[in-house]
């Protein structure tokens, strides 16, 4: 009875409990029931326990909701993990030297990289992309084309990976800054190394042929008759491509369609590096001032004329400027492919000043003095080597110390005098460095090369100063120079100023004497050179042009690429590019590029790296894998193409495997023939060749005499034979059928179109004008009325006025045939037609056009038609 009575009560209680009710208070209910728990009646005990359980459950639900609320509002425990994410997000900020670019609908990573003159890999690195896929509206960081890297961006770092200077700089910051925790210093320094401005490092450029697997070279494309265009040559294991600069004057004038070319690597038959161009036509179009390879390359070579002493002084003054002014230039030149490897720079660094000395200078706070120390140390080392009068060791050290002090005082007083003194000192030291033992150890052919040797040494000295300058110290020097101009002078005492002034005067008088002697020597050399080379009043112009020619050969080499078929143009459609390749199939496929001298070794190493083995492992068969083989001199074929001058001008050449074996076979055959001729041995091949030649001469005339359905009133038999040799192969063997003739069908263009109905062969139109001249055109399709031009590259025009001449398709455009009810035209471009006829077939006109590159076919541009014949091949 107790259970039956209590069970409905429990159900009623459980139904009345509402957790979400606003007036429900489980604590109050529990407080009311607690005194009843001590009462003796047993039947009420289950009800009290149930109420207590309900109260306990209701207390758990609010705590669960609070945990959810705490989870979504982030408490201190969750902030630790999310702080890491936020820090990671905040660390990816906009890199220096970049701008934001919003991806458009038709953009891809390759097209964006091409638009901003970079590579897809660099965009992936800059934006930390996980794939190469981009979506419309995505914001990417791209290199800013107008950004000029400052001194703070190190020229020895690349955006791809932090190099050894970065890590050493980070370690250096750890040791010199004890207040900064090491774990905080390392990521910040590494981040600045990974995300600098878009600067190509010297080391990464040296290694890009082996790590990046492509070469990107600023060069000039030397065309045949269309000028010389600057651009970028991209060499990969699969393709070779030249992309012209859009700011080039010829590109702006003619468009980039003429100059953008590419070809697969397997089409390259040979790649050779020459000291000079062998093709006379291309050599004539080569500008003399090609030494200006790009806007930044070799920016000071243009100033050199050789015999002008003032220009020599200005060049050496430029080379002797302080590092604060030359640091931005070194950064720019690292962009323009000036390459110095770490192995090349390390002996210079050891010779100039040790890293311990630099660290000591930097840790003492004299960053400006350390920068001056690098320049002055080089000055001192060169001066000590070249000095004929011995300088004591203590004087050298005092002089070095004093010049450093002079460098720190130059911002306070007597600024102009001190700057002039430092420049003059550096001019003198440059002269001394050249006139010392280095001049004796370097092989100089005659006195005429002394001026060029002086220029090379000054350039190399300037480059070594720029490359050896630690970027961190240069940046710190620039900052302290701009901020603490007044403080540096106050730090020096009066005694050091007096000592520095005395030593500066002593040093100036000593070096100016040697400067004067060196100037006199240079003037004597230039006068001797002028006497030998100048024979007229224009001698100065000739000598300067000759010096420019020497500079060009010294600064550039010429890359010649010979390919199996013409390179495809990249800025035209696929159909147009294919048709242009077909049009140029009979031409010589050579492409010349002016390449900086320091990049020639990179090209050679790149071609050699991707060369396969000559033979397979087990069998004696040749491998079909594409690659290149170095051509040795004993393996070169003595053909007409390979003259002695060409062999002398060529530095190296690599050829494809197929070309290599072709040359070997040609060499063996030629040597065998030469031996037989010398021994007067008649071979079976000679006998057969003579017999075949006579048989061919007899058969040629018969094979090129087609059968005509009607006798021609305009063409003679020999003219028919000449025309037959140039007809498309699909017409050979078919008889000639006269489908239209003015004497048979009348003079009407509409009648001409009607006679063409149902034909499916090329047609040959022969015209005779009132002057008795015979000319015409071959149409690849039957003539018809069309809305636009039609036809293929088989179309050509010809003339027998005064001699037989055929003008085939040049590939410039595809304006082959155009038919209207009122006119018929062949060729086009520039508003002119190669051949134009009116609707009455009475009046005609001929003019040169781009489609065929023809001259005027008739004797006069305007002519009157006397007779027309049209032949089909069926």
From Swiss-Prot:
Induction: By heat shock and oxidative stress.
Domain LysM: 99-142
Keyword Mitochondrion in record: yes
Principal subcellular localisation of the protein: mitochondrion
Modified residues (Phosphothreonine): 119, 341
Residues covered by region (Mediates oxidative antimutator activity): 551-578
UniProt-annotated stretches for the region Disordered: 1-89, 151-194, 299-406, 431-537
Listed Pfam families: LysM (PF01476), TLD (PF07534)
Domain TLDc: 713-874
Domain GRAM: 208-275
Disulfide bond residue pairs: none
One Gene Ontology term from the biological process aspect of the record: adult walking behavior
InterPro entries attached to this UniProt entry: LysM_dom, LysM_dom_sf, TLDc_dom
Compositionally biased tracts (Polar residues): 363-391, 510-527
Modified residues (Phosphoserine): 91, 201-202, 204, 294, 334, 336, 346, 496
Cellular component GO terms, alphabetical: mitochondrion; nucleolus; nucleus
UniProt keyword annotations, A-Z: Disease variant, Epilepsy, Intellectual disability, Mitochondrion, Phosphoprotein, Stress response
Function: May be involved in protection from oxidative damage.
PANTHER family, sorted: NUCLEOLAR PROTEIN 7/ESTROGEN RECEPTOR COACTIVATOR-RELATED, OXIDATION RESISTANCE PROTEIN 1
Protein name: Oxidation resistance protein 1
Protein's organism: Homo sapiens
Lineage, broadest ranks: Eukaryota, Metazoa, Chordata, Craniata, Vertebrata
């Amino acid at each position: 009875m107790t259970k039956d009575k209590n069970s409905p009560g429990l159900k009623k209680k459980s139904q009345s409990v509402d957790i979400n009710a606003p007036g429900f208070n489980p604590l109050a209910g529990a407080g009311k029931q607690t005194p009843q728990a001590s009462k003796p009646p047993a039947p009420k005990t289950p009800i009290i326990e149930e109420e207590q359980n309900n109260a306990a459950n209701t207390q758990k639900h609010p705590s669960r909701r609070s945990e959810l609320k705490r989870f979504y509002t982030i408490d201190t425990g969750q902030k630790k993990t999310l702080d890491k994410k936020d820090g990671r997000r905040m660390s990816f900020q906009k890199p220096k030297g970049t701008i934001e670019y919003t991806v458009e609908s038709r953009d891809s990573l390759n097209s964006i990289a091409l638009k901003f003159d970079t590579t897809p890999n660099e965009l992936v690195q800059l934006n930390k992309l996980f794939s190469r896929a981009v979506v419309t509206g995505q914001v990417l960081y791209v290199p800013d084309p107008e950004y000029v890297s400052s001194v703070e961006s190190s020229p020895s770092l690349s955006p791809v990976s932090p190099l050894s200077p970065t890590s050493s700089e980070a370690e250096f910051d750890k040791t010199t800054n004890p207040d900064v925790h090491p774990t905080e210093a390392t990521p910040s320094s590494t981040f600045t190394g990974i995300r600098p401005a878009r600067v190509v490092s010297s080391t990464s450029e040296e290694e890009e042929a082996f790590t990046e697997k492509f070469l990107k070279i600023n060069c000039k494309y030397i065309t045949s008759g269309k000028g010389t265009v600057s651009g970028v040559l991209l060499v990969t294991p699969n393709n070779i491509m030249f992309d012209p600069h859009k700011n080039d004057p010829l590109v702006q004038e003619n468009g980039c369609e003429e100059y953008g070319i590419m070809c697969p690597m397997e089409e390259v038959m040979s790649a050779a590096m020459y000291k000079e161009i062998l093709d006379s036509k291309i050599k004539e179009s080569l500008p003399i001032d090609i030494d200006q390879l790009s806007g930044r390359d070799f920016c000071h070579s243009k100033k050199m004329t050789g015999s002008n002493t003032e220009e020599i002084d200005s060049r050496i003054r430029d080379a002797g400027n302080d590092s604060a002014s030359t640091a931005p230039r070194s950064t720019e030149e690292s962009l323009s492919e000036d390459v110095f490897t770490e192995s090349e720079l390390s002996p210079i660094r050891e010779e100039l000043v040790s890293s311990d000395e630099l660290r000591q200078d930097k840790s003492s706070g004299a960053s400006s003095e350390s920068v001056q120390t690098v320049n002055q140390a080089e000055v001192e080392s060169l001066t000590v080597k070249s000095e004929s009068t011995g300088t004591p060791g203590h004087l050298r050290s005092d002089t070095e110390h004093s010049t450093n002090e002079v460098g720190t005082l130059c911002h306070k007083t007597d600024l102009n005098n001190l700057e002039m003194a430092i420049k003059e000192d550096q001019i003198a030291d440059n002269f001394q460095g050249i006139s010392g033992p280095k001049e004796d150890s370097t092989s100089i052919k005659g006195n005429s090369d002394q001026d060029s040797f002086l220029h090379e040494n000054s350039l190399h000295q300037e480059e070594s100063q720029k490359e050896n300058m630690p970027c961190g110290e240069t940046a710190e020097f620039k900052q302290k120079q701009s901020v603490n101009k007044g403080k540096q002078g106050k730090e020096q005492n009066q005694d050091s100023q007096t000592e520095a002034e005395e030593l500066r005067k002593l040093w100036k008088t000593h070096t100016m004497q040697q400067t004067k002697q060196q100037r006199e020597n240079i003037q004597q050399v230039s006068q001797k050179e002028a006497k030998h080379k100048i024979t007229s009043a224009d001698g100065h112009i000739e000598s300067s042009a000759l010096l420019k020619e020497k500079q060009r050969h010294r600064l550039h080499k010429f890359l010649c690429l010979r390919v199996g078929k013409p390179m495809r143009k990249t800025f035209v459609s696929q159909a147009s590019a294919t048709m242009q390749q077909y049009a140029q199939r009979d031409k010589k496929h050579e492409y010349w590029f002016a390449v900086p001298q320091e990049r020639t070794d990179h090209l050679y190493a790149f071609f050699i790296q991707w060369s396969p083995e000559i033979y397979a492992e087990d069998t004696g068969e040749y491998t079909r894998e594409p690659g290149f083989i170095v051509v040795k001199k004993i393996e070169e074929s003595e053909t007409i193409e390979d003259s002695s001058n060409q062999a002398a001008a060529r530095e190296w050449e690599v050829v494809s495997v197929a070309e290599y074996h072709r040359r070997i076979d040609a060499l063996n055959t030629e040597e065998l023939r030469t031996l037989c001729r010398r021994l007067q041995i008649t071979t079976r091949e000679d006998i057969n060749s003579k017999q075949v030649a006579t048989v061919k001469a007899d058969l040629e005339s018969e094979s090129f005499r087609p059968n005509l359905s009607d006798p021609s009133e305009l063409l003679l038999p020999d003219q028919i034979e000449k025309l037959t040799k140039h007809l498309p192969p699909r017409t050979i063997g078919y008889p000639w059928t006269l489908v239209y003739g003015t004497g048979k069908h009348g003079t009407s263009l509409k009648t001409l179109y009607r006679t063409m109905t149902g034909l499916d062969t090329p047609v040959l139109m022969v015209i005779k004008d009132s002057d008795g001249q015979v000319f015409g055109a071959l149409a690849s399709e039957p003539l018809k009325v069309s809305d636009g031009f039609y036809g293929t590259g088989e179309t050509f025009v010809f003339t027998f006025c005064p001699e037989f001449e055929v003008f085939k398709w040049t590939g410039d455009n595809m304006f082959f045939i155009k038919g209207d009810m009122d006119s018929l035209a062949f060729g086009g471009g520039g508003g002119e037609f190669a051949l134009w006829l009116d609707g009455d077939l009475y009046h005609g006109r001929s003019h040169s056009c781009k489609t065929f590159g023809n001259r005027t076919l008739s004797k006069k541009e305007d002519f009157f038609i006397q007779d027309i014949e049209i032949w089909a091949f069926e």
